[in-house]
Amino acid sequence: MATKSATVNEPLSGSDYQQKKLRQALLMKRLTNYIPIIGTVVLAAVFFITCLSKGVDVRTNLEIVIKQAMIVGFLATGATFIFAIGSFDLSLGANMLVSAALGATVYNLTGSLWLMLAVCVVACVLMSLLNSALASVFNLPVFVMTIAMMSVFAALSTLIISNVDANGINTKLSRASNPDNVYYQVLGNIWFQLAMLVLFVLLCGFLFNFMKMGRRQKFIGGNPVCARLTGIAPTGITVFSFVIAGIGIGLAAFFTIMQDVSISTSSGGGVGMNMLIAIVFGGMAISGGPRSKALAAFIGGFSMAFLDQFMQVLLMDSATGSAVKQIVKAVLFLTVVTLLNLSYRTKTLER
């Protein structure tokens, strides 16, 4: 009697099913890791195509993109260290404006570019340390602390600028008669500033990924209780994070002066919110932890800058261009967050 050979789909055992789910999760994780880079490339391509089709100057618009991405890049790369430990700070934009106002004032009094740079960085570090003390030493709620300090720093910047000149603090760096004009031609060059941003991002990436302090930051952000039980002191890590953030903010303030020459109360407007969007566009979760990435702010900053300038060129003849741009940015923000969340396995610890 002949027997029929048939293939029967046997149900997977428990271990096989878990292995299959694990492989799917790892594949999804790898794919989502490339979403920010792919998004940046696509937005850059759309930007160039739009500029060419509209007949606008590509070089000029590209320099605008770099200027926008550079300030946000310095600020957000430094802020990555704060978000990595599970904290956040909404006062960074106001912090930058205060230090820029102080730096411009000191330059007008002393005529020293190096002293202006030092004042910008030191002022930002001190203000960041103040936030760190309020957040870690006095155990104030982070949300309350950042809202309060944002108001304080905004009022302080207005006070400094209005006491010098109600229209803003003009450093006159771009004037040919200024002795520092030769240095301004270098420091104010957009490609030199981009090189400085790349150098800063690489340095932060090294600290974040290859140094013991960076790994501890991710540990604290992922599970602060376990980190404390293993002997990691969160206070020292928090202070370190806010200091690095202060350096990034100070550099952003210095190059803001180099770009704008003068500082007013509207300088750096919206940079704080752009920082948050850039970090998310770069593929990093605001909650921090093991998924934190030092390069996220750099990638996200350029994504956002390409998007902004692409929409600006596309809707240059539209009266509702600004509103449409904000709506598109919000939709993309939610889309990126959703795609990134697909790779999370909430029932297991992150590695």
Where are these regions (language model features)?
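Cytosolic-side transmembrane-helix boundaries in multi-pass membrane proteins
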Residues: 1-46, 222-236, 307-351
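Hydrophobic alpha-helical segments embedded in the membrane of multi-pass proteins
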Residues: 68-78, 94-98, 125-129, 148, ...
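Alpha-helical transmembrane segments within multi-pass membrane transporters and channels
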Residues: 111-151, 300
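Helix-loop-helix "hairpin" substructures at the membrane interface of multi-pass membrane proteins
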Residues: 112, 117, 127-131, 185-264
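Single transmembrane alpha-helix segments in multi-pass membrane proteins
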Residues: 42-52, 57-109, 134-139, 279-291, ...
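Transmembrane alpha-helical segments in multi-pass inner-membrane proteins
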Residues: 260-330
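Transmembrane helix-bundle core of multi-pass membrane transporters
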Residues: 138, 142-210, 260-265, 318, ...
